[in-house]
Amino acid sequence: MGQKINPIGLRLGINRTWDSRWFAGKNEYGKLLHEDVKIREILHKELKQAAVARIVIERPHKKCRVTIHSARPGVVIGKKGADIDKLRKKVADITSSDVVINIVEIRKPELDATLVAESIAQQLERRVAFRRAMKRAVQSAMRLGAEGIRINCSGRLGGAEIARMEWYREGRVPLHTLRADIDYGVATAFTTFGTCGVKVWIFKGEILEHDPMAQDKRMAESDGGGSSRPRRDAA
């Protein structure tokens, strides 16, 4: 089953935690869940060029704290913070809570599975040879310290008449090992021949302690190998 299931969902509560971190009663839960979906849709639409990997939503008392993990924080903030103010207003229109937006910079986008998948998808849309795009992504990830990476591309690759799936793997990607820190990302390339799917698994080592927040702490604490700066409140 480890081969088929989403590796992030499999590890929730073990060494990964949820991207929506709040509790609500029966009457409020559905409403807040729909708000989360709308907030993510709007932010991904507005920040297409900002290389956004994750959006974490927390709801302390009468507040909505949105943390955007981006490889290009300058694009999110905009000139003198103008763009982030617009984003805050758009999010505030969806939710009745006070909105606070934080931005976390991803220092090594080559080690973030979502950003790697989106990068390959964009290259496929620009008609870059799919094998070259995949090999380049594999080499970059391994050079920057990944212990293993696997990339799947499927669809009418290179404009072929019959759709197929091709994959590359380097190093170890132990999908069955629950203590493995595996990042997973998907993206879709809309080419002139049809859609192509891209899936990326990146193995970053093992997390031995049983702590749902272990992966976030590891990202924040590791100096050279970490993928995030300390949080910066943009409110």
Swiss-Prot record:
Record GO cellular component, one term: cytosolic small ribosomal subunit
Keywords: Ribonucleoprotein, Ribosomal protein, RNA-binding, rRNA-binding
GO molecular function, one term: mRNA binding
Function as written in the Swiss-Prot or TrEMBL entry: Binds the lower part of the 30S subunit head. Binds mRNA in the 70S ribosome, positioning it for translation.
Assembly and oligomerization: Part of the 30S ribosomal subunit. Forms a tight complex with proteins S10 and S14.
Pfam families according to UniProt: KH_2, Ribosomal_S3_C
Family assignment from sequence similarity: Belongs to the universal ribosomal protein uS3 family.
Keyword rRNA-binding attached: yes
Record-linked SMART domains: KH (SM00322)
PANTHER family: 30S/40S RIBOSOMAL PROTEIN S3, SMALL RIBOSOMAL SUBUNIT PROTEIN US3C
Record-given protein name: Small ribosomal subunit protein uS3
Record has Ribonucleoprotein as a keyword: yes
Domain KH type-2: 39-107
Chain residue ranges for the region called Disordered: 215-235
Example GO BP: translation
